[in-house]
Curated annotation (Swiss-Prot):
Pfam families: ASFV_360 (PF01671). InterPro entries: ASFV_MGF360 (IPR002595). It is found in: Host cytoplasm. Induction: Expressed in the early phase of the viral replicative cycle. This is Protein MGF 360-9L. GO terms for cellular component: host cell cytoplasm. It comes from African swine fever virus (isolate Tick/Malawi/Lil 20-1/1983). Signal peptide: none annotated. Plays a role in virus cell tropism, and may be required for efficient virus replication in macrophages. In addition, inhibits IFN-beta-induced IFN-stimulated genes (ISGs) transcription. Mechanistically, degrades host STAT1 and STAT2 through apoptosis and ubiquitin-proteasome pathways respectively.
Length: 353
């Protein structure tokens, strides 16, 4: 049955994917993007296309359409409620600028408007959206006009200990988006960055270790053959607490020293990691106490003085598949931490030698 234009439009607006036989009509009606139909969810204010397979905010879709100089979609998205002022973030030709003016765009965005869009769009954690964020922001001269301190504060909060001092904003932003892709295992975005930024292969490895992404760590080691000094890898894995997956992979799969992992965790004061290493078999308690005292962490030294710890035999030391490792550690709780906690509640640690 041939549907009317009105019915087709309603299907698009109601987020119903039209049948293959209707694609020609959708192309003729301008409801076509990235070699596929456009779907719009009116309540969520999100657009779906063959590129934005997980959906994207309509304002972000507008910015993408402006960047591509797609006049029909600029008009369409504006009619659907997109804020035409955000076109200023990606406009790159005078003809497109004139069209946006006709649609009501102002001459310049205020600083708070740019930061608002930045904060809004980065919360949409999909691979296609992170790629869009990189395309729009990483080399955008409009960011030179806003407060660098505020923008860097947003970036530092996300990257934490991964942050490096650099005055080159474009490089900082590229690492920021790449790091987010690895943290949330957005494989589409990860592969996008990997193919374009060969000099950031080690950055991807650092992010995989720091953000506990054992799947990406496994791919980097088995497929991409990206390498780093093993002690450096342990430092990145142990820098963040509860990084059980990447610590397990480094020590059990790749053969890193469990006691060194415990020492690094002591330096970073990450108790969860310390007890995980003990559960896996770390036993250099005297050396660990020395590291603790050297780093002014006497509480950890007291914890390590308890003579009650042993390897947790329920943890398999033979797994190499990331999926199996994740499943094994999903509900993991440290038996040695439980014993230390019970001792502390009953006796405290003040009188331990």
């Amino acid at each position: 049955m041939v549907l009317s234009l009105q019915t087709l439009t309603k299907k698009v607006l109601a987020r119903q994917y039209p049948a293959q036989c209707h694609h020609h009509f959708l192309k003729c009606c301008g409801l076509w993007w990235h070699d596929g139909p456009i779907v719009y969810h009116q309540n969520q204010k999100k657009i779906w296309s063959s590129f934005f397979t997980d959906g994207v905010n309509i304002n972000a879709a507008l910015v993408k359409a402006v960047k591509e100089n797609n006049y029909d979609l600029i008009v369409l998205f504006t009619e659907w409620g997109a804020n035409i002022d955000y076109s200023l973030l990606s406009v790159n030709t005078e003809c497109t600028r004139d069209l946006c003016r006709e649609l009501g765009a102002k001459e310049q965005l205020k600083q708070q408007e740019v930061l608002h869009f930045f904060n809004m769009v980065k919360r949409d954690l999909t691979g296609s959206n992170i790629i869009l964020c990189h395309e729009v922001f990483s080399h955008n001269p409009i960011l030179e006009t806003i407060n660098r301190t505020k923008l860097r504060g947003i970036i530092y909060e996300q990257l934490e200990a991964l942050m490096e001092n650099t005055d080159i904003l474009s490089e900082l932003l590229t690492k920021y988006w790449y790091g987010m892709a690895v943290e949330f295992n957005l494989t589409k975005a990860i592969h996008y960055f990997y193919q374009r930024y060969a000099h950031l292969h080690q950055w991807r490895l650092m992010c995989a270790l720091f953000y506990n992404n054992v799947f990406d760590l496994h791919e980097l080691y088995t497929k991409e053959k990206v390498r780093m000094d093993m002690d450096e890898m342990l430092k990145w894995a142990c820098r963040k607490n509860y990084n059980y997956l990447t610590i397990y992979y480094c020590c059990i799969v790749l053969g890193a020293d469990l006691n060194k992992a415990m020492f690094h965790s002591i330096q970073f004061y990450n108790l969860g990691n310390i007890f995980f290493c003990i559960d896996l078999g770390a036993d250099a308690f005297e050396e660990g106490k020395t590291v603790a005292y050297q780093n002014d962490k006497s509480f950890i030294a007291s914890i390590l003085s308890l003579n009650c710890y042993s390897k947790n035999d329920s943890l398999s030391l033979k797994e190499t598949d990331p999926e199996v490792i994740k499943r094994m550690l999903k509900d993991y709780h440290s038996k040695n931490m439980s014993m230390a906690h019970k001792y502390y509640i009953k006796y405290g640690f003040d009188n331990i030698d």
